[in-house]
């Protein structure tokens, strides 16, 4: 089982998500409940987004916690959370623009998907990256993780420390970072003869899963 609710709650609070709903706050983040094909190899078309929550205050994050956990355990889902908080105003504006574009081109089927599509692809207000350290990339995961963290800190960045936090995942860790010099990072990894992990911009990290190993 992986339960990152406490760590993520603190993380989004530091990014400006208020405790209670505040009309003056433009920020939100989304949580997706996803069924992964590798968790259900016997199911056809197993990759599926079961539900998405749009959260703009910690009260709602707390409110939906139990529901998210129950859904994950009942249906074998993983809960993922966006690492970048987003703008409600920009989401509304981009949705209107996309509706207008679709209608101009004669496309009006399934309009309810437009908002979800906009939110899923929307840039964050403050860019954070996910560095995916997987146990498949190394023999010793903990040693590999520390090597990657040290290598990131050796790169040029606009921030004193590009490392924000480390999140446990089902098969390793996600290092959430500020942007850093990727080319420099790859050269450092090559010099150390370590496999550079995948770097994912505007991505998601694991909030919760309790899937039994096959």
Predicted regions and their residues:
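Signature for HUH/AEP ssDNA processing cores
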Residues: 1-169, 180, 187-188, 204-214
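A common structural junction motif
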Residues: 156, 189-199
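Short hydrophobic/aromatic beta-strand micro-patches
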Residues: 176-178
């Amino acid at each position: 089982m992986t339960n990152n609710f406490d760590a993520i709650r603190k993380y989004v609070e530091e990014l400006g998500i208020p405790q209670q709903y505040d009309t003056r706050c433009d920020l939100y983040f989304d949580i997706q409940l996803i069924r992964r094909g590798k968790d259900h190899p016997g199911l056809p078309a197993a990759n599926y987004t079961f539900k998405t929550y749009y959260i703009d205050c910690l009260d709602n994050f707390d409110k939906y916690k139990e529901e998210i956990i129950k859904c994950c355990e009942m249906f074998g889902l993983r809960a993922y959370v966006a690492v970048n908080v987003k703008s409600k105003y920009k989401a509304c504006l981009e949705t209107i623009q996309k509706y207008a574009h679709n209608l101009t081109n004669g496309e009006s089927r399934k309009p309810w998907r437009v908002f979800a599509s906009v939110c899923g692809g929307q840039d964050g207000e403050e860019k954070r990256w996910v560095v995916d350290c997987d146990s498949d990339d190394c023999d010793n995961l903990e040693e590999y993780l520390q090597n990657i963290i040290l290598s990131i800190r050796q790169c040029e960045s606009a921030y004193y420390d590009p490392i924000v936090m480390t999140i446990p995942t089902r098969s390793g860790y996600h290092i959430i970072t500020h942007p850093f010099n990727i080319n420099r990072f790859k050269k450092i990894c090559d010099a150390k003869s370590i496999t550079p992990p995948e770097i994912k911009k505007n991505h998601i990290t694991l909030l919760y899963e309790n899937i039994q190993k096959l």
